[in-house]
């Protein structure tokens, strides 16, 4: 029983580490996108936003992906493009 608990705790720690790494990657990408948007002319920003939104609209997610997840992604992309980090 102790071995099972120790193994589960070890796996949990691994998952937590993976989660932290993914969070760091997302934060880094947010910073990069924000910096890029801030250094673009307004019309270039709008063109990029339109292209990204168009690409998202055309993508048909796999049936195994819940609609809520797809909507979450679309909303987050929209938020990042229209209201970048402060």
Curated annotation (Swiss-Prot):
Pfam families given in the database record: Anti-adapt_IraP
Keywords: Coiled coil, Cytoplasm, Stress response
Cellular component annotations (GO), alphabetically ordered: cytoplasm
Localization terms from the record: Cytoplasm
Predominant location: cytoplasm
A single GO BP: cellular response to starvation
Role according to the record: Inhibits RpoS proteolysis by regulating RssB activity, thereby increasing the stability of the sigma stress factor RpoS especially during phosphate starvation, but also in stationary phase and during nitrogen starvation. Its effect on RpoS stability is due to its interaction with RssB, which probably blocks the interaction of RssB with RpoS, and the consequent delivery of the RssB-RpoS complex to the ClpXP protein degradation pathway.
Quaternary structure and interacting proteins, as annotated: Interacts with RssB.
Xref: NCBIfam families: PRK10244.1 (NF007598)
Name of the protein in its database record: Anti-adapter protein IraP
Species per Swiss-Prot/TrEMBL record: Escherichia coli (strain SMS-3-5 / SECEC)
Gene that this sequence comes from: iraP
